Swiss-Prot record:
It is found in: Cytoplasm. It comes from the Bacteria. This is ATP phosphoribosyltransferase regulatory subunit. GO terms for cellular component: cytoplasm. It holds the Pfam family tRNA-synt_His. Keywords: Amino-acid biosynthesis, Cytoplasm, Histidine biosynthesis. HAMAP family: HisZ.
Length: 382
């Protein structure tokens, strides 16, 4: 076996891609900071039970497992940073008011999520803890869209759903609740024959409501139809009101409502949103409310947030990250060394051409040169 081969769906990040990823990472983290979010850096490795407090069977299957040589306990390589940030908020920070946290780091998946997807993503995201009102969801939605615009993306479609609708329907019908997982699978796959089979012997109101969900999709006007076809329950009314506000505040993007889109249902407790762009089949960013995540760490707090994969964002972003630079000669000259140091201190990229290698590097656009004029080193256009 060749020593240079990597595992399937694992790849090196080469300079051009790395430069773009880093440019986007800095832009997004700076924007998060401008909203008041504080950076945290959870470890890549944790005890397995700490990583799998939420997310259900899917997260368990995606998590690499290994044995700790010190304790003998099972460890996991994180597949999602969100539970780790919830642990930090619940157990370490222990603040009483609103906490805004952000992060950026690698996550590993045992299996790729698509044919050409990587198993090593660079996840970046932001979370708000401590506020149960819709204001927090609106801020997270705005921040997510702001981040995508900052990455140069346009023609964004925002898909909105709400975990509270199905939860309310199951809560009022014990027989339906017993089939919750099967109903979730049928609705998520829009498998109408299976849905009809699962609901045949349910109460008339519950049966009609569940069968209506796959057809309740479209623009924001579908919410009016949902109010006529779904039971008048406080939880459903509140969910539809929340979706109406989220849709109205999503400026400059196309909005789609899908009350049967339940991806992440086991994880989310309220509004759910996903962002798409033309030509990319999968969501480029996902978010929503997950109020119960901190409960496993001894302190349940209202929470909402979003995340995305920086590697995928860099692949589709039109942002140009090829930096400009100053080309300087290599010489043992005190004045030259001082000039180069001063330029670098000022934030300039200065590349000194090593002897015999005077070509301009492809990774930088050397648009200026450092040359000696009348005993002084000056920068001139190339």
């Amino acid at each position: 076996m060749s020593t240079w081969l990597l595992p399937e769906n694992i790849a090196d990040v080469l300079p051009s891609e790395a430069r773009k990823i880093e440019e986007l990472r800095r832009r997004l983290l700076d924007r998060f900071r401008s909203y008041g979010y504080e950076m945290v850096m959870p470890p890549l490795l944790e005890y397995l039970e700490s990583l799998l407090t939420s997310g259900g069977a899917d997260l368990r299957l995606r998590t690499f497992k290994l044995v700790d040589q010190l304790s003998g306990r099972t460890l996991g390589l994180r597949a999602d940073i969100t539970p780790q940030v919830a642990r930090i908020d619940a157990h370490l920070l222990n603040r009483q008011g609103v906490t805004r946290l952000c992060y950026a780091g690698h996550v590993m998946h045992t299996r790729p999520r698509g044919l050409h997807a990587t198993r090593e993503q660079i996840q970046i995201g932001a979370e708000i803890y401590g506020h149960a009102g819709l204001e927090a969801d609106l801020e997270i939605q705005q921040l997510m869209l702001d981040a995508l615009h900052l990455a140069g993306l346009s023609r964004i479609r925002l898909d909105l759903g709400h975990a509270g609708v199905l939860a309310a329907l199951l809560a009022r019908d014990a027989q339906a609740a017993e089939r919750g997982e099967s109903l979730y699978d049928a609705l998520s796959g829009k498998d109408v024959p299976l849905l009809n089979e699962l609901t045949d012997d349910l109460g008339a109101d519950t049966r009609a409501a569940l069968r209506a969900l796959p057809n309740l999709y479209g623009d924001a006007s579908v919410l009016a139809e949902a109010r006529t076809r779904l039971p008048v329950l406080p939880e459903i009314t509140r969910a539809l009101d929340d979706l109406a506000q989220l849709a109205s505040q999503a400026k400059g993007v196309e909005v789609a409502i899908d009350l049967a889109d339940l991806r992440g249902y086991a994880y989310h407790s309220g509004a759910m949103f996903s962002a798409y762009i033309d030509g990319v089949p999968n969501a480029i960013a996902r978010g929503g409310r997950y109020d119960h995540v901190g409960q496993a760490y001894g302190r349940s707090r209202p929470a909402t947030g979003f995340s995305l994969d920086l590697r995928e964002l860099a692949r589709i972003s039109p942002v140009e990250a090829r930096g400009t630079a100053i080309l300087a000669p290599w010489a043992q000259d005190d004045a030259l060394c001082a000039a180069v140091a001063a330029l670098r201190d000022a934030g300039e990229v200065v590349i000194q051409a090593l002897p015999g290698h005077d070509h301009v590097l492809d990774e930088f656009a050397c648009d200026r040169s450092l040359v000696e004029r009348n005993g002084a080193w000056v920068v001139e256009p190339r």
